[in-house]
Curated annotation (Swiss-Prot):
Cofactor notes: Binds 2 manganese ions per subunit.
Record-given protein name: Cytosol aminopeptidase
GO cellular component: cytoplasm
Swiss-Prot/TrEMBL catalytic activity: Release of an N-terminal amino acid, Xaa-|-Yaa-, in which Xaa is preferably Leu, but may be other amino acids including Pro although not Arg or Lys, and Yaa may be Pro. Amino acid amides and methyl esters are also readily hydrolyzed, but rates on arylamides are exceedingly low; Release of an N-terminal amino acid, preferentially leucine, but not glutamic or aspartic acids
UniProt keyword list: Aminopeptidase, Cytoplasm, Hydrolase, Manganese, Metal-binding, Protease
Gene, per the UniProt record: pepA
Record-annotated active site: 279, 353
Keyword Cytoplasm appears in the UniProt entry: yes
Location relative to the cell: Cytoplasm
Task of the protein: Presumably involved in the processing and regular turnover of intracellular proteins. Catalyzes the removal of unsubstituted N-terminal amino acids from various peptides.
HAMAP family, alphabetized: Cytosol_peptidase_M17 (MF_00181)
Record organism: Pseudomonas putida (Arthrobacter siderocapsulatus)
Pfam families: Peptidase_M17, Peptidase_M17_N
Predominant subcellular localization, coarse grouping: cytoplasm
Amino acid sequence: MELVVKSVAAASVKTATLVIPVGENRKLGAVAKAVDLASEGAISAVLKRGDLAGKPGQTLLLQNLQGLKAERVLLVGSGKDEALGDRTWRKLVASVAGVLKGLNGADAVLALDDVAVNNRDAHYGKYRLLAETLLDGEYVFDRFKSQKVEPRALKKVTLLADKAGQAEVERAVKHASAIATGMAFTRDLGNLPPNLCHPSFLAEQAKELGKAHKALKVEVLDEKKIKDLGMGAFYAVGQGSDQPPRLIVLNYQGGKKADKPFVLVGKGITFDTGGISLKPGAGMDEMKYDMCGAASVFGTLRAVLELQLPVNLVCLLACAENMPSGGATRPGDIVTTMSGQTVEILNTDAEGRLVLCDTLTYAERFKPQAVIDIATLTGACIVALGSHTTGLMGNNDDLVGQLLDAGKRADDRAWQLPLFDEYQEQLDSPFADMGNIGGPKAGTITAGCFLSRFAKAYNWAHMDIAGTAWISGGKDKGATGRPVPLLTQYLLDRAGA
């Protein structure tokens, strides 16, 4: 779908479908009044009959109104005379998109300037959410279907904006388009079956991305290099699988050479059986999504590349497959990490933190401004925050605050959890420096505490996306593309873009 921005009168625009908002109690905004006047009161007449109550997201399609160049007019309810919340605004846009997809028109014009959104400016903030909602709603994953989804007739959507705000709306669309591209890439990787999407496949994806972008350098560390670097925890996770582990390093130089980079670390467990600590069989197919941390880093990088942000960014993807076998890691094994700290592996299903801890140590060599790791790390985070909010922890209040703010601006929210010293005690082991689990209580926090022991050399934050990275079961099952909006917004803010 192509999104364009124009500053023209809605009543004079030629299009297959013109979309205008109508409030409750038959209230018409400036745009609706102009269209009503041009159509000789057709809008008012419909509202007087009570055909549309004007509640947010309600729609009514009108055909061939006199005095207009539009073939159809789609009225959409915008509610009472007050600003909408982000969720209501997104639902309104999705409702419009749903109607447009069912029509045979190749284009549509959205004249929604009169709708206010709470805590969003009238141009960039509001239209960024609108554009992301439209573009993300276009996503289809039918790669393995013998019958593909029929191509939609709607190819172009024009957003009408006032002249003063046109440049900001265009900027919003540019950013939204890049984020949507990144989210789609993230969702594609997450939705791929694990027999195809394994560590070596992700390494090939990185190499292809590197070939397409001169500013991006790619290095892939194989299992021998991982072992030679002393990454005993990382190596242990993959040793039970026929698919060898890979540490993928993508280095984007968009800023000045002297600028310290931001580092994103993604957990890339391409399939997680739990290892010897085997998971239950029911729902195990969804463990292909255990690489969504790495997928979201990939997606964020795609957005950054498309926008050519003036920042230096290093992406580290810690990829392995966690399988049981005669060579797999056992509960009770003790490994030495790259940092020199030893870990007693009490549960092989707590493997994400093992690949991450060595990768966090590896990140020190880049002398980063900040390091953010992203992982589908704990089921406890789903219990605590559900599927709406990402868990966030860190050792630097400024960094955590910046990420929380980015989440609000991107409507991709996170919530901070504590890393108090008392939780660290739950990781004590009688045989090693620490265990890899901290007991049944506060599992998300103790996982963060574990990682914090390997991130003391820099400002660090940990994002647990176990609840937000994918939707379980039902017709909407699949990867969500989160937290690409949050991460991209964070980097946009750092770049001043």
